[in-house]
């Protein structure tokens, strides 16, 4: 029905937005499983600060905080040559713990205007805008080409004089930024922060990317349309399980 289609699109928007950022990280052969925790913590801190200042600072603050978290992870991985999976896994646990600590001290509510932004029409417009931007950057620029080339053979890319550390750092910054985008949208949907905000989003995003046909090693298998198709696929599967009477916990 039309209602079901609309519901699927609404649920797909945050997954697809997250995938638009994570695809950069995956294309270079790395991974970022901290985006859900990053989104939740960034939106929570930004909403908390905006409660005592201006509610219109909430969105810019969310994007700044989430990008800084992504930049910090990118710096650790490039500086200390740590494994991206283990680094982002540790940050996932740490960020969730910090968020739970904040929520134990304060009640965090979302600004009212976020209800409008998280609505069907506005959130879909936001997705379309970012799809166009990311398509251009990822598919039509040298930066996107270098990202995919790193996934194929990083040594070769480094040998021709490309700063692979800089590219990796920027990819994690982009992933962090996009985490902030779907973070404030999901916060607006539930009207306030809770310990379950953006729960399992990192897994949904990873599954969306790989279900779409992008290889774990990244490279030139990384295509934007695959991430979008994968995002719809994972949401349709989840809704299908619920429609079949499967409880929420097993379906997740």
Question: Where are the model-predicted features located?
Answer:
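Single transmembrane alpha-helix segments in multi-pass membrane proteins
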Residues: 1-52, 77, 81, 209-221, ...
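Helix-loop-helix "hairpin" substructures at the membrane interface of multi-pass membrane proteins
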Residues: 52-56, 60, 69-73, 119-194
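Interfacial loop-to-helix junctions that mark the boundaries of transmembrane helices
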Residues: 2-10, 53-60, 113-124, 193-200, ...
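Transmembrane alpha-helical segments in multi-pass inner-membrane proteins
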Residues: 194-252
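Alpha-helical transmembrane segments within multi-pass membrane transporters and channels
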Residues: 53-92, 230
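Hydrophobic core segments of alpha-helical transmembrane domains in multi-pass membrane transport
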Residues: 21-23, 96-97, 126-137, 175-182, ...
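Transmembrane helix-bundle core of multi-pass membrane transporters
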Residues: 80-141, 170, 189-195, 250
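Inter-helical junctions in multi-pass inner-membrane proteins, predominant
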Residues: 1-7, 109, 138-139, 172, ...
């Amino acid at each position: 029905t039309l209602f079901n289609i609309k519901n699927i699109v609404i649920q797909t928007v945050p997954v697809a937005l997250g995938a638009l950022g994570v695809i950069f990280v995956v294309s270079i052969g790395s991974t970022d499983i901290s985006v859900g925790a990053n989104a939740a913590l960034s939106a929570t801190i930004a909403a908390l600060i905006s409660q005592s200042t201006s509610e219109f600072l909430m969105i810019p603050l969310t994007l700044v905080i989430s990008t800084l978290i992504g930049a910090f992870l990118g710096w650790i991985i490039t500086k200390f040559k740590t494994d991206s999976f283990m680094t982002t896994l540790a940050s996932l646990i740490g960020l969730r713990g910090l968020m739970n600590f904040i929520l134990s001290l304060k009640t965090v509510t979302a600004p009212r205007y976020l209800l409008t932004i998280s609505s069907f029409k506005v959130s879909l417009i936001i997705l379309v805008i970012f799809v166009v931007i990311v398509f251009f950057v990822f598919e039509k620029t040298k930066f996107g080409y270098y990202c995919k080339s790193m996934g194929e053979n990083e040594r070769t890319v480094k040998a021709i004089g490309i700063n692979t550390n800089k590219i990796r750092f920027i990819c994690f910054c982009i992933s962090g930024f996009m985490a902030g985008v779907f973070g404030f949208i999901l916060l607006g949907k539930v009207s306030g922060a809770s310990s379950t905000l953006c729960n399992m989003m990192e897994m949904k995003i990873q599954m969306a990317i790989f279900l779409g046909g992008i290889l774990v090693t990244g490279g030139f298998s990384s295509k934007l349309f695959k991430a979008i198709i994968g995002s719809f696929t994972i949401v349709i599967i989840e809704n299908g399980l619920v429609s079949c009477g499967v409880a929420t916990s097993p379906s997740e």
